[in-house]
Amino acid sequence: KILSAAERLFAQKGYAKTTLQDIIDTTGLSKGAVYHHFKSKEEIAAKVGDRLGARVAAELARIRDDAALTGLQKLQTVFAVSLLPGRQQQLQHMLPHLCDDPQFFTMEYHDLLETTVPLYITPMIRQGVADGSIQTESPEALGEAIFLLADLWLNPQTRPTTPARQRARCAVFQQMTQALGLDLLTDEQAEELAALCEAE
């Protein structure tokens, strides 16, 4: 109940403008009841982030297990879903403080290499090798390289920049992945990422 209320408030008002009192008022619980579960707004935000992460994992599992798609199509779908219009903006609005938190980067890096890539991305790449849609001798290394770049460098939420610099990043990412035969980031998706950035 507390996390659902917090997630709604973060989405509506943004993290910065949501107070712990707002969350308490929305739940109808006493201050003591909320403090029994959570010590701070930051702790609530971390749990909201965990819930969002669980939804992402379910989406990745659905894509990985979709028998109708080739390995390459699965990777393209991962990019399309993660860059859906509105999804990035919602995350940026809800949890903007994460890009300033070194602990978040450490957790994100660990989660990517220990969970996301081995459980979801590598199987998609292995399938792509088997069905001929992806050429690589190192599915694990390819998955790690692409998704570390995408998540920690290409993503303007984790590495804020200007629209012009974001377009340059997208162009380099497209050149690199296309050289590997992987058409992952469309021009429209690149423009959506640039639109998330603030001009200098």
Q: Where are the model-predicted features located?
A:
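Hydrophobic alpha-helical connector segments
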Residues: K47, R51, A61-Q92, G143-I146
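Short, well-structured alpha-helical segments
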Residues: Q76, T122, P139-F147, A190-A194
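Conserved hydrophobic residue
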Residues: A16, L29, A130, I134-Q135, ...
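All-alpha amphipathic helical-bundle segments outside canonical DNA-binding/catalytic cores
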Residues: L72-Q73, L112-L113, R126-A145, P163-A168
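C-terminal peripheral helix-coil segments that are non-catalytic and often amphipathic
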Residues: L119, P123-D131, R159-E200
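Hydrophobic/aromatic residues within well-ordered alpha-helical segments
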Residues: V48, L52, V56, V78, ...
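Helix-turn-helix
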Residues: K1, A5, L9-E43, K47-R51
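Short secondary-structure transition hinges
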Residues: L84-I134
